[in-house]
Amino acid sequence: MSTKYVEVGELKEGSYVVIDGEPCRVVEIEKSKTGKHGSAKARIVAIGVFDGGKRTLSLPVDAQIEVPIIEKFTAQVLSISGNVIQLMDMRDYKTIEVPIDYVEEEAKGRLAPGVEVEVWQILNRYKITRVK
């Protein structure tokens, strides 16, 4: 798993974190100081990249949180069969299979064999983000 750790206080909306083993995009972050001697806390609301589930997390601002390293690359669609899309990685020409559920909605209608797409690799899973 390719991840790194950052402090919760460094996170911004739009950044990515790992919550319960699932990569998520932060949609809301709220920081508040609890009292005179309490440490500041952060409340994070994030949406799962692959499952679309909403997750909430509350941590101290100085705590470490796992952040996924997202690798973006270009691939070519080889075939679409049932619920699986077969891609060829344009860097090393290896074949990748991606479930149709891991395709962004706006890209689903434009997929066809021979089309080049942008693929994100997050925690050894693949997601088609857009058609080039």
UniProtKB/Swiss-Prot annotation:
Pfam families for this protein: eIF-5a, IF5A-like_N
Domain of life: Archaea
Subcellular location(s) per record: Cytoplasm
Matching PROSITE patterns: IF5A_HYPUSINE (PS00302)
CDD domains: S1_aIF5A (cd04467)
GO terms, molecular function: ribosome binding; RNA binding; translation elongation factor activity; translation initiation factor activity
InterPro entries referenced in this protein's UniProt entry, alphabetically: IF5A-like, IF5A-like_N, NA-bd_OB-fold, Rib_uL2_dom2, Trans_elong_IF5A_hypusine_site, Transl_elong_IF5A_arc, Transl_elong_IF5A_C, Translation_prot_SH3-like_sf
Main location: cytoplasm
Key word Cytoplasm present: yes
Gene Ontology biological process terms in this record: positive regulation of translational elongation; positive regulation of translational termination
Alphabetically ordered keywords of this record: Cytoplasm, Hypusine, Initiation factor, Protein biosynthesis
Cellular compartments per GO CC: cytoplasm
UniProt entry tagged with the keyword Cytoplasm: yes
Sites bearing Hypusine, chain numbering: K36
Family from the record: Belongs to the eIF-5A family.
Family matches, as HAMAP family: eIF_5A
Protein purpose: Functions by promoting the formation of the first peptide bond.
Protein name, per record: Translation initiation factor 5A
Protein species of origin: Pyrobaculum islandicum (strain DSM 4184 / JCM 9189 / GEO3)
Gene: eIF5A
